[in-house]
Structures are given as structure tokens and as C-alpha cells.
Amino acid sequence: MPQPSSATLIRQVFNVLTTIVLCSAVAGVFVSFRFPGTWIRSGEILIAIYDRLFASRKKNDHDPEAVILEKQTSKDTVGCAVGWREEEDIFERCLEALKASDVCAVVVGVDGDTTEDMPMLGVFGDVFPDAPPPIHLDTPVGDALLDAESAIAANIDQLLSIVETQITTQLGIDRSQLCTIDAICIYQPHRNKKAILLTTFLAGIVMARAKQVPFLFSCDSDTVVAPQTIDQVVASLRPRPQAGGASGRISTWKSNQSFLCKLQSLKWWFDQDVSRTQTAATGFLECQPGPSCAFRATALEQVLITWYSASAWGRRCVTNEDRDLTAKLLHAGWEIYYVPHAVVWTDVPTSLAGWFKQQLRWSRGTHFQRLSSHGLYTTMNPYFTMYVMKDMLMPFVACAYLVWFVLTGERFLRLSEYDLAVSLLVELIYTLLTAADRIPWTDLVYLFPSYIFYSLTKPAIHIWSLFTMFNNSWGNPFDRGARPGLTMPEYAWCGGWVYLTLAASLKALSESMNYKKRNAINETFAVVVFPSLLALGAISAWHLALTRPKRRWTEQVGSVV
């Protein structure tokens, strides 16, 4: 079994110093080079290409026995799915896909036991008519873990015994008969996604032990798994004893439903093909996303308790549980792999408010994990750490840049609209060359608005989520029932950010005019336009806050932990 991630003091000092040098180099590019955004984006693409052509090929050079292992089917894997009040047709599609994937068993976890949660149990019964009745837990296993943490924190077998006893007792079977079950459903009182994941993982490990198989595959209840995906993802684990987890590519199955879905589809594709691939070139992945992740069962056993009970600054964070679980696996010494050709499709928000809530949830969890696990990064590859730091700091730099530019008209970075255009052109060319067989040509027209949309909105979400890091919830449903409402501070922040970017755009437009007109516009802007925009933003935010739906978002998605 891998040993916890460790590095000598000299190695950690070297990593820190190298990271500082890399970060300084990136800062120098933004300050000194004419097209910094283009240079940075081109560098990221080159590293992604390197990983595709060389690093991945080297990592996949297995011995003949390993190749034979990779040709096995998913019969050595237990498939898991978790959800809360999912739409019935979406959930049915998810379970049908798992059933068709030829896994040895399916474990379904439902985070709720009230009347509103019963339709999910009905869907499970329809898809698996021969399965035993759903198993109800009066108290989630996670509650018992937190209440008696000191007594059982070091004993995963005790938690597994609790779940196994519940299954065998309620089904009226002996332990030896667990291997005959092909699908089970467990439901418990509503808590949060992390709580139902813990229960489902424990049940999955119980089933894996009973069937004597080494792997688990987990997805969300709104995910559709392609027929060969599970086998493709698990194939990256079979020949590598040090591999504790792997994930596949996520695509949006609502990509044709709305303009916002199109933007998300293009953004997801580029992020996974460039951002995730370039960090994979360093041997590390920061997140195994919930819709597609495979685990070695022994790796999960090693980290489940520390993952679930982890806290920082006296608080537990239950958002972005997948990212935190990945960090725990890395810290325990396990390797994490990315399999870009293994595809799953997942549900995405179709409304702007739903999208905003989803992004906030993800970003809050990212902040919590990075800040609470900061010691982990001193043991990682310096480039990986530099990438994480750049991702953390650049939104704040962008905000400061916009404010300074609006107030003074000066640019302390050499960013410009021309740099934005050239960077987009580089991204478009790369997309055309690498995604012609995976993205419809008609969808490429959305690349430009997707680039602009995420470039303008990411800093706002990133900054706001840092200051609201401890707001936890499932973060869904996206578009079910009443429209998800934003809180008054969220409206105020969004309104202020919109007007800040608008003010910066007007300022940049004035720079492109002749000297006299530019001076006149600047004077008018300083005296009239900017104060008016701020006042209008405040009034608009206040109005939207007063007219928003009275039901709070947290009342729609469940309790906040």
C-alpha cells in the first residue's frame, strides 16, 4: 500500500523556490510582454500537446501482462450512483447506463427519506425489477462517525460492519449471500452529498469485498455513462498498483438546449483538454469530478474517514467533496489518472441563476480544499503548484486591474483587447485541429462568446465564493420547480461586477478615439458616467433583491450544514 505523501525538507524548499521562480516568470510575462494572455495560453496548449504525444504514451507503456489486464470487462467493478430528488427521466437514464455497462453490481444512494424522495426509489425498482427492496438507514453513517469520531476514527472496518449489518439484516440474508445481489439501493435522512457519498462508498466496498473485486466507479444521478467508459477508466488502474483513482471526460448532454448550455459545453471541452491534461503531464490531478471517477477499493478504505471528518478553522465543508477526496488520495501517496477518451454526459443548468449557484458551490469547495490542504502543495511538482497559485490569484489581479484602469486609465498589466482577440484565435485554431471529430462545426461559433462569458464572470464568482466559503449545500436542483433565487448580497455583487466591466469597456473604447475626444470622454466619465454607473448598479441590485422570489435557495435545496 502506498505511503503518505512526504518529501524531505530540502525537497520541499526546492519545490517552494522553484514555484516562486515559475510564478515570477508568469508575472513577468504579464508585465513585460506585449500579448501576455496569448503567450500564457499558447504555453498551456503546448504542454497539453506534449502530454498527449509523449507523456501519456510513456505512462501507457505497460508490460504484456498489463495489456491483458486492460482487456478485462467491467465485471471487476462495482458501479455507484448518488443523488437527491433527481428528475425521474434523468435518473432512469443514469441507472440504465450503469446497468448496460456490465458492472458486477450497482449501488445507489439517495439522500432523503421523505415523500418527495420516493420517486427515485421507484425508478430504481423499475430499472432493477429483480433487486431487493431499498434499504433505509434511520441515521446516516456519517452522523455516527462524527458523533463517535474518537472511538472509530482509526477503524474503517467498523464502519463497513455497520453498513453490512444493515444490509444483511434488512434483506434477511446471510453475509455469504451478498455476492448474489446485483443491485441495491440505500436511502437515508437528507444531509448533503458528502454524507450520502460516504454511505454509498461504504456499501460499494462491502459489495466489492463480497464479490472479490478491486474497483469502484462512481457517478452522479444526472450522469449518463457511455457503454465502454467504466472499463476504459478502470483500465488505467488495473496494471498500476500505485494508482488509486482515475476519471474520464465530462460532456454536457443538454448542449443543444439553450445558449448557456452551448457556452458550458465549449468551456468544459477546452478546460478538460488543456487545463486538466497539462496538470496530468506533471503526474497530478487536482480533482476527480463526481460525474466520472473510479477508485481502487483499498485506496478508498484508507482515506474515507479522514476525508469525511476533515475540518479546518473549526468548520466542515461539504461542497466540492470530489476535489477534497482527490487531495486525500494524493496525500496518501496514490496516483490519479485522467482518461480523456472515456466519456460521460451530465446535466447542466439551463438558467443563469442555476449556473451561478453551481459555480459558487464548486468554487467555494475549491477554496476550502486548497487553503486547508496548503501543506500538500509543497510536496507536489512545482509546475502543478504554480498552476494552482495562478488559478487562485489571477481573478484578484483581474479585479484590481479593472478597478485601477477605470479609476486612472492606466494599465499595470499589458493586457488589451487585441491580446484577448489573439488569445481567442489561438484557442480557436487548437480547437479546430483537435476537436473536429468531437465537436460539431456549427458549435464552434459559440467559442468566442464562451471565452468572453467565462473570462468576465470567473473573477466575480471566484472572489465572491472566497468570502462565502462556508455556505454549503447540494447546489441543485438547477431548473426544477421555482426559479432559484439569489440573495441580496449576491445580486449586489453581480450588479456591481457587471457595471465595473461595462465601465472598463467604455474606458477602453475611449482610448481608441483621437486625443481631444478621448480627453472629453475621460472627463465626462470621471465626473458623470462612473458615479452614475455605481449608483445605477446599487439601485438595480436593491431592486432585484426586493423583487426576487421569497423562497430562499437553501430552502429549495435542503438544509445547510
Task: Walk through the language-model features, giving the residues of each.
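Short hydrophobic helices that act as membrane-entry/anchoring signals
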Residues: 11, 15-22, 26, 44-51, ...
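Membrane-embedded multi-pass helical conduit in multi-pass membrane proteins
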Residues: 30-41, 388-473, 490-561
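Juxtamembrane amphipathic/hinge helix adjacent to a transmembrane helix
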Residues: 369, 373, 470, 474-480
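Short, low-complexity, Lys/Arg-enriched N-terminal segments of secretory-pathway carbohydrate enzymes
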Residues: 1-10, 461-462, 475-484, 556-561
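Loop-to-transmembrane boundary segments
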Residues: 6-10, 378-394, 479-503
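N-proximal low-complexity "stem/linker" segments adjacent to membrane-targeting elements
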Residues: 2-96
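Juxtamembrane membrane-interface segments at transmembrane-helix boundaries in membrane proteins
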Residues: 1-11, 21-27, 383-386, 483-490, ...
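Non-transmembrane catalytic domains and loops of membrane-associated enzymes and transporters
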Residues: 63-385, 389-393, 560
